[in-house]
């Protein structure tokens, strides 16, 4: 009878590669869609952000956009009225005053056009953030750790989630 030696080793077998998933700390997490031990596929949604505040900001910005457009329309009507008056008057003082008023309204329109452009960019920024309201897995693997508070045991910054890649082990 053969009573050979059997080699036994202590340790942990884990994937050679792991990657860290970070979240935007300035945003509120709505839902974590996975838990430790879950297998995840590349492209799978792991976390979703709460977008309700961003949606409210978009609505508010669109209302402000409408207000700015109304100011532009009002200035255009004033210019039309002032131009009619300018064409009818013969008094030089009135012509000067009306011309100044027209230029003032034209300047107001230009300022409001810049405000429109700025507000449209703001809306685009909010909409881009709403579109990017989830964090997806970049690789397939298994969720090793979820760290909701963003720090490790020693209080140092740590990844929100660690995923062990499927594949070779060590």
Segments predicted by a language model, with ranges:
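Short beta-strand-turn/beta-hairpin segments enriched in glycine/proline and small hydrophobics
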Residues: 4-29, 121-138, 162-165, 170
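Long, amphipathic coiled-coil "stalk"/hairpin helices in large membrane-associated assemblies
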Residues: 6-60
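Short charge-dense sequence patches
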Residues: 10-13, 93-97, 105-109, 133-139
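Surface-exposed patches in structured soluble domains
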Residues: 12, 31-33, 39-45, 136-170
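Residue-level signal for the solvent-exposed faces of long alpha-helical coiled-coils
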Residues: 28, 53, 57-60, 64-67, ...
């Amino acid at each position: 009878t053969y009573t050979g030696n059997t080699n036994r080793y202590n340790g942990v077998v884990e994937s050679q590669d792991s990657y860290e998933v970070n979240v935007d700390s300035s945003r509120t997490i709505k839902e974590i869609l996975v838990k430790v031990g879950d297998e995840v596929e590349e492209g799978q949604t792991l976390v979703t952000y709460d977008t309700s505040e961003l949606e409210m900001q978009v609505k508010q910005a669109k209302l402000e956009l409408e207000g700015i457009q109304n100011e532009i329309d009002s200035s255009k009507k004033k210019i039309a009225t002032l131009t009619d008056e300018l064409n009818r008057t013969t008094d030089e003082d009135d012509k000067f005053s009306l011309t100044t008023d027209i230029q003032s309204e034209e300047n107001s329109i230009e300022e409001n056009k810049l405000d429109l452009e700025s507000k449209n960019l703001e809306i685009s920024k909010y909409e881009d953030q709403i579109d990017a309201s989830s964090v997806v897995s970049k690789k397939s693997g298994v969720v090793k750790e979820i760290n909701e508070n963003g720090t490790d045991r020693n209080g140092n910054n740590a990844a929100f989630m660690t995923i062990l890649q499927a594949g070779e082990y060590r």
